[in-house]
Amino acid sequence: MNDIRNTAVPADVKQPEGLPAEDEFFGRMNDPTAAASIKGVCGDEMEFYLVIRDDRIEQVRYHTNGCANTSSCGRAVARRARGRNVTDALSISAGEIIRSGECEPAAGRHCAILAVTTLYRAIADYLLAP
C-alpha cells in the first residue's frame, strides 16, 4: 500500500456526483496523523485521514471515487468517529451504519463494510506506528 499520508491534495479534486455540497468530512487531508486506503470488491476506493491527539480523533476526512451510497457510508462513519477515543471508534460497526438509514440497506452493505474497514485500518496505522 502506498503511504497516502504524505500525498499532496490536488487542487482539482471534486466531490462525487450525488454527494451533498455541505459534506464537511469529504476530501483529502495533508499531513494526517494516520491514513488508510482500501479498494472494495465493487471497485470503489475509500480513504480515511485522521488527526489524533491524546488518543482522541480530532479531525477526520474521507475520500472516495465510489457511488453516492459509498459516500453516504463514509460520511456516516466519519461523523461517528470525530471526537471519539481511538479504541472507542473501533466499536463503530457496519451494522450500525446500515441500521442508521444513512445508506441504502440492500445495496449499502458492502459500502458500509468498506467505510468501516478503512477507518479501522487508519486507526491501526496510528496504533502500530513506531
Predicted feature residues:
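Short, well-ordered strand-loop elements centered on a beta-strand within folded domains, enriched
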Residues: 54-63
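Short, thiol/selenol-centered motifs that function as redox-active sites or metal-ligating centers
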Residues: 64-73
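C-terminal binding/interaction regions
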Residues: 2-35, 58, 84-130
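Iron-sulfur (Fe-S) cluster-binding segments and ferredoxin-like electron-carrier domains
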Residues: 72-88
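Short beta-strand elements
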Residues: 44-54
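Short Gly/Pro-enriched turn/cap motifs at secondary-structure boundaries
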Residues: 37-41
